[in-house]
Design a protein with these regions (language model features):
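Extended substrate/RNA-proximal surfaces in nucleic-acid metabolism proteins
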Residues: 54-123
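An N-terminally biased module of ancient metal coordination in phosphate/nucleic-acid-related enzymes
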Residues: 1-73
């Protein structure tokens, strides 16, 4: 029998709908043997997913999806696996990316508000 795996999963720490532990339970229930949590620009959910995975004897690979811009308008998403989620420099970089994303999101909300669409960041 082939080993089922999904190596590109987002949790509620980025744009996913399920918490890391919920993802582990969901994929375990669907007979996956390996998953990777690869949230956008953060590794905050990886440790809790790995703990849940250990309890269910399922491999959870540490991962991240980093957004970057190559040249002027070429946006890239780079997936990283087996990363050190406790690396201080990684934490610094992801915090910078988080602040930039929050600033961009606020600007988008302001544009939408001027067009008559009132939304909050939670929306």
């Amino acid at each position: 029998m082939a080993l089922k795996m999904d190596l590109h999963i987002h949790s509620t720490y980025s744009d996913g709908r399920l918490k890391p532990v919920e993802l582990v339970r969901k994929f375990h229930g669907e007979d996956y043997g390996i998953i990777a949590i690869t949230d956008h620009d953060t590794v905050k959910g990886v440790a809790e997913a790995q703990i849940a995975g250990e309890a269910l004897e399922m491999k959870v690979i540490s991962g991240i999806e980093l957004g970057t811009i190559l040249e002027e308008k070429l946006k890239l998403h780079i997936l990283g696996y087996y990363i050190d989620i406790e690396n201080d420099r990684l934490e610094e970089v992801t915090e910078i990316l988080k602040k930039a994303r929050e600033k961009r999101n606020q600007a988008l909300l302001e544009v939408l508000d001027k067009q008559g669409y009132t939304l909050t960041e939670a929306d």
